[in-house]
Amino acid sequence: RFTSEEVIWLTLEFYRRNYIEGLFLSSGIIRSSDHTMEEMVRIARELRTIHNFRGYIHLKSIPEASAHLIEEAGLYADRLSINIELPTDAGIGQFAPEKRPDNIRQSMGNLRLKIEEMAEPTMQTKRRKKFAPAGQSTQMIVGADGANDATILGTSARLYGSYGLKRVYYSAFSPIPDSSRNLPLIKPPLMREHRLY
């Protein structure tokens, strides 16, 4: 695991050398949702305000984190994402019972409202502060549950319509040794991921 300082240093060094054009920042939960989100916001804030970083920042938000932290993240990140995880609520309940689909959708809805609110001009200015100017996206794992392509595409269509997403990403399920017995042992063909796009 990298420290926040290491992530900042690596990002700046790779950016200066033209190895990268930006940063995709994601993390598993460390201590708590808020602690993890605070660290990710700190990285984005320091890159922008202290180091004048002009590259792209995509920050993967944690739905259980406090709303003010997700709002602060949007001031420094070009795009925010909240992962839907799986195409159906039943799949989430079966394979990720610690996740709450309603919380995920509520966070996505709140983020959409904030993006729209910050895009509206005010009486004092023609534009407000930038807030996640590249919008929000999500990702779902395909092939872990029994959802067929029609179900996955239906879920994607609802997500685009309901939350104003800029992109739904698909990631083919990859089995992990010694994981839950509920998960399939065989990886779905990569062609399925490509077909969904």
Task: Identify the meaning behind each predicted range.
Residues 138, 149-184:
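A conserved active-site cap/scaffold subdomain adjacent to cofactor or substrate pockets
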